Amino acid sequence: MHRAKQPANIEKIHSSFSAQAKDFESERMNFSKQEYLDYTIRAIQARKTDALLDAAAGTGACGRSLSPLVASVVCLDATDAMLQQGRAMAEAAGLSNIRFVQGYVEQIPYPDAAFDIVITRLAFHHFPEMERPFMELHRVLKPGGKLVIIDMEAAEEDLRDREDRIETMRDPSHVKNRSRGEFAALYERYGYSVKKMEHTDIAVSLDAWMDLTQTPEKIRRQIAGLMEAELSGGERTGFSPRREGGTLWFNQRWLLMLGVKGADKAGAPCKNPG
């Protein structure tokens, strides 16, 4: 079996997420808050016979939450420190049907049509391009299976570059937030019947957000300064910051998209009619 080709920004991903692993599910962050995980579980409607892939899983918060509801779970991630953290949590919870596997979404180490459900959460904004990861997620999903993507939605068009610039200041592994239309186009091109495309606002503390990535003090001040400037009537950042009790907060716009795969060939998009 040939060695998986590494994504172009893999060193930045390893560096960022090795640092984040220990605090990735911190109560100060909302990324793994139980109400959001429960919302995802309700949306997926998994069956006890399902084989599930949690791709770019991080610590496997989604996979671990879904583990009691399905036959088996694979949590795939590029960063070993994240997998170690997730594996320890799964063992502590007594989850016996879950595996943690190191690998890349761009080259998933499983055969075609291996899973009934494929989910990836907060990953696409780290991918240099969308097509290859989507094609691989599509390839390993069975016909009739569910492909669930949860990610941050891009700001309005004239603010996208500015928002991504600030995101990259905070986390150099960030590439760009994608729009609802960009995701919808992929689902359509690969022949999915889209069942859900829903928006949720996630409240985020600016300090906790920067603490997670261990953002250097100089950059923290720059980012906070940009947020403060917007609050004072200056240039918009795309974050729509607000002050609560002396602390800066903003909302992340999360999209949840769920599509059911059609019966076309595993690795190929559907041909456009006509």
Residue ranges and their predicted role:
Residues 1-47, 61-65, 82-85, 93, 148-174, ...:
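Conserved class I S-adenosyl-L-methionine
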Residues 53-107:
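Class I SAM-dependent methyltransferase SAM/SAH-binding core
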Residues 106-117:
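A short acidic, Gly/Pro-enriched loop at the edge of an enzyme's catalytic core
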Residues 116-129:
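A short SAM/SAH-binding and catalytic strip from SAM-dependent methyltransferases
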Residues 131-143:
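A short glycine-rich, Lys/Arg-flanked "PGG" loop and its adjoining helix->strand segment in the class I
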Residues 176-191:
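Short alpha-helix
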Residues 195-274:
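Conserved Class I S-adenosyl-L-methionine
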